[in-house]
Amino acid sequence: MVNEPRGNGSPGPRWEGSSSGSESSRTSSRCSTPGLDPERCERLREKMKRKMDSGDKWFSLEFFPPRTAQGAVNLISRFDRMGAGGPLFVDVTWHPAGDPGSDKETSSMVIASTAVNYCGLETILHMTCCHQSREEITGHLNKAKQLGLKNILALRGDPIGDQWEEEEGGFNYATDLVKHIRNEFGDYFDVCVAGYPKGHPEGESFEADLKHLKEKVAAGADFIITQLFFEAETFFRFVKACSEIGITCPVLPGIFPIQGYHSLRQLVKLSKLEVPQQIKDVIEPIKDNDAAIRNYGIEQAVSLCQELLASGLVPGLHFYTLNREVATIEVLKRLGLWIEDPRRPLPWALSAHPKRRVEDVRPIFWASRPKSYIYRTQEWDEFPNGRWGNSSSPAFGELKDYYLFYLKSKSPKEELLKMWGEELTSEESVFQVFAHHLSGEPNQNGYKVTCLPWNDEPLAAETSLMKEELLRVNRRGILTINSQPNINGKPSSDPIVGWGPSGGYVFQKAYLEFFTSRETVEALLQVLKKYELRVNYHIVDVKGENITNAPELQPNAVTWGIFPGREIIQPTVVDPVSFMFWKDEAFALWIEQWGKLYEEESPSRMIIQYIHDNYFLVNLVDNEFPLDNCLWQVVEDTFELLSRPPQDKRETEAL
């Protein structure tokens, strides 16, 4: 361990003046080495080709923008849950009535951008040319490119009234839109178009519709997604007809698991499809029983998909979810396409933005708030690759709005109060909230604490390796918000701590990050003198007054992996400079997400305010990863010192 030298040349802790991460400049130094996972840099069509060449089947999911801000929060949560099953891509529909190209949180553009940037999903944005000028469409495409979207589903769109009216200076057909994309943007976008297995409802004939489809492909479309259908033979005839007229690109069948009588009627009305009589005969008698219809819909979809997959004509399945998850996930599980335990390319959640696809290093502080980290680094032109580098001023943007919908807690205020306490009576009340979050046991009101302001997701699997120790220290006022155990050469396939390619080994230094009182910090600093050559620490208050024994600009790698034929990868670091940016956010969350649940000047609000104003944020790293984790002993020694009579404490300080 390297420490900042004192004036006499010996190592020791260093006090820093008040500072805030927001005061640093935007200049940064970054190193670039080959990425860990080449697949992250593949285009969607390249991913499709690789899977088709290997015979691996895939699935994809369609969603539509919500109508409300809370609906947007719920949809992003659904992206995270359904993204865990391993879709090759998702697509987001274009709703002309919902101002789809705007910056509204319910717009198609923002929802698709969020799926890419904050949920790490390969995403296709629908775009229609109906009632839009050439300039408007070009503007939408430029905006999509800027936001990191690389895939477009080009559609004509539906007329607002009953009759189609040509747009002066616009486009009249999806073919025109595909040509425009290729003329203006070259090969930047992968382009998908729609196919109609029974012909477009407004088409002259099935043959004429196929001719238009071939024109769309010839104009530059890369693949086709079909409208929904209910019988496999419908798709087989369509694919055969496509092949006969020279369409050779992938054709993905659109699958709609029937989930309710009214939703089926509405979808059939919009798509102008005819439901087969045998399906009507089953549904009509049970039309008022949603559970029975959903169960039938699952069985029907599984049977249809099995027939499609068995044909050898289907490389993947595209599901129309209607923003629901239960039926689609059940179908995918029965087909064996849902990934129950996805392998993690890196220890943290990825972004699918093209400029972040070589990113493979992040500070550990945002481990439980990856969307916040992505938001605060969205203006970076380059991202750390290979190592964090020796940067004196990483350009973290300020997090002024804690209620951006993709950063907002998934739980409404009423649920948060039930979890965190409708009334707090003391600091110990807060300690109990942290303890209940770790234990998973209901609190005194009978509610489970499933989240905290610093962690809106389920606890990481590796937390189970330290659960008893974490519970013990949280009950005594060491309020942990981030931690990891030490790991010495576990296989990369390990179900709890594994990440990266097969055949590798992963390593971790023990890490502990927590809030605690001034009294505890004073005792901790006395104890840390015994661990000076082993434990790095950084302690800071809300004003930025901080003490550390880590050299100012030296990041400490706390997670790394060794893989066959590759350089060592170190995806997680403890960086003292970044910690000062993180502390602003970490302290603010006390007030923004917890304190503001209560009335101003109320006892509960004042307790949270007191913790915000007086507690310290601490991080500890045990550098001796091959040995038993010493951080628990550090904390136990601190508690033991706190329990001594004042005279004994003074004698200890004098040693």
Curated annotation (Swiss-Prot):
It comes from Bos taurus (Bovine). The keyword Flavoprotein applies. The modification Phosphothreonine is found at residues 33, 93, 450. FAD binds at residues 93-94, 126, 156-158, 173-174, 196, 200-203, 209, 216. It catalyses: (6S)-5-methyl-5,6,7,8-tetrahydrofolate + NADP(+) = (6R)-5,10-methylene-5,6,7,8-tetrahydrofolate + NADPH + H(+). One of its GO terms (molecular function) is methylenetetrahydrofolate reductase (NADPH) activity. NCBIfam families: fadh2_euk. Phosphorylation of an N-terminal serine-rich phosphorylation region increases sensitivity to S-adenosylmethionine and inhibition. Belongs to the methylenetetrahydrofolate reductase family. Pathway: One-carbon metabolism; tetrahydrofolate interconversion. This is Methylenetetrahydrofolate reductase (NADPH).
